[in-house]
Each structure stands twice: as structure tokens, then as C-alpha cells.
Amino acid sequence: MPHLTDDDIYYWRQGTHTHSYERMGAHPNQRGTWFGVWAPNADRVEVTGDFNDWRFGADVLDRREGGLWEGYVRGAQPGDKYKYHLRAGGEWFDRTDPYAFRMEPPAQNTYEGLSALITDLDTYTWGDDAWMTTREGPSGIDGPLSIYEVHLGSWRHEEHGASLSYREVAEPLADHVQNLGFTHVEFLPLAEHPYYGSWGYQILGYYAPTFRYGDPEGLMHLIDTLHQRGIGVIMDWVPGHFATDPQGLTYFDGSHLFEYEDPLMREHPDWGTRVFDFGKNGVRNFLLSNALFWMDKYHVDGLRVDAVASMLYRDYSREGDWSPNVHGGRENLGAISLLQDTNEHVYDEYPEAIMLAEESTAWPGVTTPTEHGGLGFLYKWNMGWMHDTLEYASKEPVHRKHHHGDLTWTLSWAFSENYTLPLSHDEVVHGKNSLWSKMPGDDWQKAANLRLLYAHMFGHPGKKLLFMGGEFGQHREWDHDRALEWDLADEPLHEGLMEWLGDLNHLYQNAPALWNDQEDGFEWIAYDDRENSVLTYRRLNGDRSLVFVLNFTPVVREDYRIGATGDGRWHERLNSDSDVYGGSNVGNRGAVHSDPVEKHGHSHSLSLTLPPLGALVLEPAE
């Protein structure tokens, strides 16, 4: 009896087979394994492996409609290595299974190229039932979302310098994230990638966790551990382009199957990778299924979609050397449709999922629902906020008054999409320096500036994201071959920075005023004090509010007045200059009472002492 049903073939040919991984690839049972592969240009497909001593001609697959091939091999069992042996145009070549659930480490290759391993993904016993039934709460758009971005291979190393495995990293990572109060971890791509220096963004095996850190059950254990600690997991996903390694997807069946046939569109000029042909139904099946695969089999809570702008524009980085769409335009209609369909199918099956877009242009409607013509993402990275805020924060305080608009004008578009504010890996590599090194001044001022930067990130509308190392102020920029500088975390200024970040996260998770990222959740009190480089704004959610007062100079400002809503006492919820965080302990002794002095359009005001390079978070007493 065939493994592929008539329905499978129908949905495959329509480009709507959203769980094609259940039919394609290798699927073992008690007596053997079913194999399925898409290779329409091939006139013969065989599977070779440990089970037939890698003999050509031993196990030939049957051709089905839609360019599909399938076959059953008795005796092929989990753990056996295998490859496809294809003939097209009179030539034979070998390919790794595009749907492989696991790939072997290259050092163990017994056959030219990278082999897949037959793998049963249903043997792991999950312990995250409580998380899976309640996760819609912490991931809702009206709730807190604070993400710790991690490159797993360089987060922490063993004593002899090796990266920690999925299992080894699970407990220490969960401890660290839980102690700091982040709601989610976002992993840079963990799908199989031959080139470690790509950070995972040049993928060969879209369905296989990279062998570098262990086996599939190891990754399941890591995610399970995080879930049991109440921490969500987001995976970086790269549906726009893929690695060119000859054993992978490139020229898979002797034709440009997964990539564009058009030479002007085929290669990505920035990364030297191949670009998926988003209009092909087989490619759409492959990518749509892959998005759901990570949620189905690995309990991933969401995907951060990489380089969306490079998918949306046919002329992206091509400087005039590109092919227009059927209407003569630059929009990539296939990519737009794929992204919309992916988001629709994800939210149909996982309404609580988090879909984030790294989209660096002003493309309209990234987070608008697809039924209203948008791409359908839940969040978009606010790249403009990241650029302008870091540009401002890196300037000497004496010059900041001349660049005051860099901070204020980000609010002019803050509500045009559902944004996430990313202080990401991209900002601490390639000569850009670490966040610590970007800050001006001596070590005390660098620490104070970073505390101030983080306060503004948590006060500004938008969800939060911080790349690893930023929590304690790593000195050197990130290097994927080296572990973080964990010894710094024990030094007073760096320890204080972590304490501050933890308290910001705690405040964020417990202050509904910070969850409302719509226009009615933000109110300027004073945005125009450029002479003193001070910003004052209020965050609101119903009758709950918090006031942020940010002093971007090292000058203590006495009797600094801000407008207040009525008569009453205000608590100093947080003060970044507290000695607990390594500051100079300048502040307002924990509280201040409003006076009947008009200011900023209010009948009452607060007389404050602003700490140097300091942030105050004030809350009205109940």
C-alpha cells in the first residue's frame, strides 16, 4: 500500500500540503522505513545506506504524480545513515534528504557528502503539559514579551573550550533566564548548517537540528526544560535563502528545483546563497511545513523570520540587475503570498504563536492581518528605533542636546506596526563594538549609560529583545568562536547592570501600564528639553500609569519639575543610580509629593532630583 495517498498528491500539487514532512523524508516502522522525495527532473531515484551496504540499485523508489518518489525499504531502522542516489539527463549524483530529521557530523562521514540518519521523533517524553496549556497568556499581544537572544554555541563553553550540548546548556540557561526575568529565549538558527561562521543563517537541513550540540532529543530536552521553568522558546527561521553546499538543495535533481531558474534571481548577492523560488508549489510545501514542523515536533512557541526585506523585493541588493514581476514591479509576489500563507496556517493551528518579522524597510502592513491585506505577522522588529537610539546613546553627553530628535521622533511611527525593540546580535559584531564599548565615558559612565539605555527600552512602546552578553555589559564584541566574558559578571558594575536588568524585567512583567503598546498607552510629559537632554513620558493602561524621567547627562539636576496628574504622593519604583546597581545613590528618598505648581499643562507638579546619567520610574500611590 503506498505511503502517499491521493490527498497527499493533490495537496502537494496545489502547494498547500502544510504537513508534508509527515510523508516526505524517512519514516520508520517496526519492519522498515518509508522514503519520500521530490525530484521531478530525475528519471530514477534510489536510496542507499547502512541497510543495503550503500549498494547502488538495491532499493529503487517508485515515481508518483507531482514529481514525487516513494518506496519502502525493509530492515531500514532508526540510526541508519542514508542518501538519495538520483539519475537525470544520463548523470548520477547523490543528495542528502531535504526532509532529513537528523544529519551526521561531517567527521563521521562514511560516504561522500553529508548523510541523513533515519530518526523517530516520537520517542521523547515531554514534561511541559502545563506550559502548553497555558502559554497563550504570556505570549499574548497585550501582555509582556521580553526576549533573551542566544547563539547557543558561544553562550558558554566547557573548561576545554567546547560548546555546551543541548542537554548540558538546559539547566544553566534556564537558571540564568529565569533569574533575569526574561519571558522568552530566542535562538539563532539551530537547523543544520555546514558553515558555523554563518551563525546558522546558511541552512542545509531545514528539518534537522544541528549535530553540533547533540541529537534531536537533546534539543527537545532543552526546550522542555525552558518550558517547565515558564520560559517560552522562539526559533530563528530562514525561509528566504539556503546554503549552496552540493550535497544539499542546490541543483537537487539535476535542475534548479528549490532555487530560481532565472540567473538574475537565483543567487543572493549579499550572502552567496541560493534564493528559494517561492512560486513553486513544492517549495511552498517544503517551507510551510517546516514552519509548522518546529511547533508540532519541538513545541517551539514562535518563529523570528530572518531577512524578510530580502524576500519582499526582487531588486534587493541587486543594483538594477534584477527581473521584474509579471506586473513589471519590484515586489516578489511569491514571497508575499508565502509569508501570508505561513502566518495564516501557523495561527490556524497555533493561535498563541509568536511570529516576528525582521523587516528593515517601510513595507506597509507587516503586522496587519492577512484578511486586511497585510503580511500577518504578530510583531515586526523596530530597526529604526534600534539604529537611532544606539546612535544617540553612543554620543558624548555634551553633544546629545544637538541630537535630541533621535530619541523623540521614534514615537512618530511607534504605533504604525506592532513592534519589538531589538538590541540584537547584528549590533555587536563586524566592528560595531559591544553595547558596553559603544557607550561614552569611563567604566562608571558606561555602566550608567547602559542602565539608562535599558530603562528607555523598557519605557518605550514595543516588546523587548536583548542579545546575550548585553545583560552584564560584555566588553568585546560578540565572536561566535568564543564564549561570553562571564568573569565580568562578578565585577560590581557588571553585576549591578544585571541586577538593574532583572528589576526592569520584574517591573515589566508586573506593570500592565507597560504592556499597552498602542497610541493610548503613551503620553509625553516633556519631549522638548533638549538643553538638559531630559525626556519625560507616561505609560498608561486604563487607570494604571508609570512615569519615566531620563537624564542623559552626567549632571545632577535639583528641583527639576515635571507635570503631575493631581495632588498626591508618588513612589520612586526604580532609580538606576541606586548603589545597588553601582550608581551614586542620588535620588528622591523613595518618594515625592506633588505641589500645586502648574507645569506641562497640569495643575500640579513634582519637584525631582535627577541622578546623573540616570533613570527614574515613578508610580502614583494608591
UniProtKB/Swiss-Prot annotation:
Annotated region described as Disordered, given as residue ranges: 581-606
Annotated SUPFAM superfamilies: (Trans)glycosidases, E set domains, Glycosyl hydrolase domain
This enzyme's EC code(s): 2.4.1.18
Transmembrane regions listed in the UniProt entry: none
Catalytic activity, as annotated: Transfers a segment of a (1->4)-alpha-D-glucan chain to a primary hydroxy group in a similar glucan chain
Enzyme category, top tier: transferase
One GO MF term attached to the UniProt entry: 1,4-alpha-glucan branching enzyme activity
Pfam families named among the record's database cross-references: Alpha-amylase, Alpha-amylase_C, CBM_48
Pathway: Glycan biosynthesis; glycogen biosynthesis
UniProt keyword terms in alphabetical order: Carbohydrate metabolism, Glycogen biosynthesis, Glycogen metabolism, Glycosyltransferase, Transferase
GO cellular component: cytosol
One GO term of the biological process aspect: glycogen biosynthetic process
Superkingdom assignment: Bacteria
Catalytic center residues: 306, 358
SMART domains per record: Aamy
Subunit structure: Monomer.
Similarity section: Belongs to the glycosyl hydrolase 13 family. GlgB subfamily.
Function recorded in the entry: Catalyzes the formation of the alpha-1,6-glucosidic linkages in glycogen by scission of a 1,4-alpha-linked oligosaccharide from growing alpha-1,4-glucan chains and the subsequent attachment of the oligosaccharide to the alpha-1,6 position.
The protein's name: 1,4-alpha-glucan branching enzyme GlgB
Source organism phylogeny: Bacteria, Pseudomonadati, Rhodothermota, Rhodothermia, Rhodothermales
